Amino acid sequence: KFSKNFSALISSKKCVVAADTRPSGHIIVETVKAGLMESGIDVYDLGVVPTPITFRESRKYGAGLVVTSSHNPIEWNGLKMIIDGIGINNKQLDTVIKDQVTNKSKIGTEHYIKSDYINDAAKIIGKISGTPKVTVDVGGGAAKTVASELLKKIGCDVNTINDDLV
């Protein structure tokens, strides 16, 4: 229901979707994608990525939705809704909460994408001289998909720990 109502705010008819590593994330993402596509929104699935990457990508596509619950207990989950790189405001939240009539003339399409974040960040940072040895504790979070890869790309010898806690 919430993703269908959220679709009323998406003028671009495109939305990036992502999740953190919580066990319930996958099933919620699939439900969210179905609601968006049923409402005519083309969905671009980033998979598991940190929330800021979804905010960044939402500026390209017009909207974003992250399934996450940040620092709450692991059994909790929620939806962060984004329009043009900014979390929705109270007026937009009212639209999401109230039932909306959505355009069902076309079904949206589903795409699996990868953000250019790592390449873009590596260009800004540049190569590190030498090959420093770095251990990264990602704590089982969504950074597990980017932290080690970025450090390797800029020239570090990376040892990743705690990448699969959930």
Listing of model-derived features with the role each one plays in the protein:
Residues K1-A34, E38-G40, G108-V134, A142:
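An N-terminal, well-structured beta->alpha segment
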Residues K4, K14-W76, E149-V166:
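N-terminal small/polar loop signature for handling phosphorylated ligands or for N-terminal nucleophile
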Residues E75-V166:
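Gly/Ser/Thr-enriched, mixed-charge loops and adjacent short helices
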Residues K1, V29, T51, T68, ...:
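Short, electropositive, low-hydrophobicity segments enriched in small/polar residues
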